[in-house]
């Protein structure tokens, strides 16, 4: 048991030391430029029921959950796969339930 405590204490010390050194090395200007670069990297999301075949992880979020890129083959015609951002039914029902609970107690 004492060995476990010693190892945990050592890990906590190492993590706190490394994080404090990393924060001290960054200046405020560098932090702001890093945040600006991160914001420019963010790409626009794909709205619900729009084509997401170009990037299947680009669907927008609803109020609680992220929509899912769902692919299917339409009936009739060609065998081309179509992908759209959709909200799964179980998540839709969960959002409706939480909204009703919020309205009940809100």
Swiss-Prot record:
Predominant cellular place of this UniProt entry's protein: secreted
Signal peptide span: 1-20
Tissues in which the UniProt entry reports expression: Expressed by the venom gland.
GO CC annotation terms, alphabetical: extracellular region
Alphabetized Pfam families for the sequence: Toxin_35
Keywords: Disulfide bond, Knottin, Secreted, Signal, Toxin
Disulfide bonds: 45-60, 52-69, 59-85, 71-83
Family label: Belongs to the neurotoxin 19 (CSTX) family. 02 (D7) subfamily.
Protein name, per record: Toxin-like structure LSTX-D8
Source organism (scientific name): Lycosa singoriensis (Wolf spider)
């Amino acid at each position: 048991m004492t060995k476990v405590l010693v190892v945990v204490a050592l890990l906590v010390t190492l993590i706190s030391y490394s994080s404090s050194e990393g924060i001290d090395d960054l200046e405020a200007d560098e932090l702001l430029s890093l945040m600006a670069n991160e914001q420019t990297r963010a790409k626009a999301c794909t709205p619900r029921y729009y084509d997401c075949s170009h990037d299947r992880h680009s669907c927008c979020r609803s109020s609680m959950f992220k929509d899912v890129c769902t692919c299917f083959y339409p009936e009739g015609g060609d065998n081309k796969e179509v992908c759209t951002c959709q909200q799964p039914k179980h998540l839709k029902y969960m959002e409706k339930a939480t909204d009703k609970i919020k309205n009940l107690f809100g």
